[in-house]
Amino acid sequence: MAVWAYDLFEIPEDPAADAAFRRFHASVESYWPPERALVTRRYADLLFPFEEISVPPVPMTAAWSLERVLGYLSTWSAVRAFVKATGEDPVAAHAPNLAAAWGDAGAEKTIVWPLVLRAGRIA
């Protein structure tokens, strides 16, 4: 049995862009649905009646431009909830700061999503 999800992405090759993304996330974090906390806590609170299997870290990676990242952020349920609650688009509001930190908007950066995974077998 396994349960998995991916956590917030990181931009390890560019600390300035990563920090700008973290600031963006902080602005919408309270708008995530409550069940998102399971992922944030890496499924630690999930009743898991199986013999745990140790799983090595498995990241997902992609090379994305700033435009692609901004488009992706716009799909988040937290962003949609923010817009519904405030009438404002947080992606548009943060885009100038994200762009300044990113540099060349056409440049692709390596985006890394840590995989959140619990695996086990029936004992």
Would you name each region that the model predicts?
Residues 1-63:
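Conserved catalytic/acceptor-binding region of the Class I
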Residues 39-123:
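Conserved Class I S-adenosyl-L-methionine
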